[in-house]
């Protein structure tokens, strides 16, 4: 379990089904444009179906047990409000993984998602032993891009037609961090930047709140 104030990340459970489905139901229109979909089968390829909730949890647990994934739900003030998964974990000479997430629209803009991502990045670098974390985001997904912008992720370029999202192959921007870029920890850096941007301006000053470093604004899910 990873905790910072009102934000908690814990392993996803089968008994989360009712709360998970309710959050998804209320956020259908908010989430649909950014959700992964299954492409039509080829004449000789297998026919894939969207998994049930239980099938999804079993798959996530299996991948976690194999060391390839870290699946979490996000709680805010004791309520399930989203999901965050570190997937594609690769060891050997790479020691990397990629992060995907979504969050309830009702808590968007409260710092929940940046805090959750910062918590999991620190966990991956300091406890799990990964060296690099990347987040792939559709260019149109401004709410998600703002998450990595706030956290200071570095933009690395475009992957054309990278993932099948909302019924078609979509381009994604790649954002990344390595352990060397946040020796003091990402959560600590995020707290300082958030405090600085929220502090009152001196009389007579103008301008926008402080934005960390230079990356562009998030993984293919709303935040």
What does each model-found stretch correspond to?
Residues 72, 123-125, 153:
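Conserved hydrophobic/aromatic "anchor" residues
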Residues 14, 139-141:
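A short coil/beta-turn micro-motif at the C-terminal edge
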Residues 101-103, 109-123, 142-150:
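Conserved acetyl-CoA-binding loop-helix of GNAT-fold acetyltransferases
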Residues 126-136:
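Conserved GNAT acetyl-CoA-binding A-motif
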Residues 78, 111, 141, 167:
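Conserved G/P- and acidic residue-centered "switch" motifs that form tight phosphate/ATP-binding loops
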Residues 136, 154-171:
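Conserved catalytic-core motifs of GNAT/GCN5-like acyltransferases
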Residues 1-106, 169-223:
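GNAT-family acyltransferases
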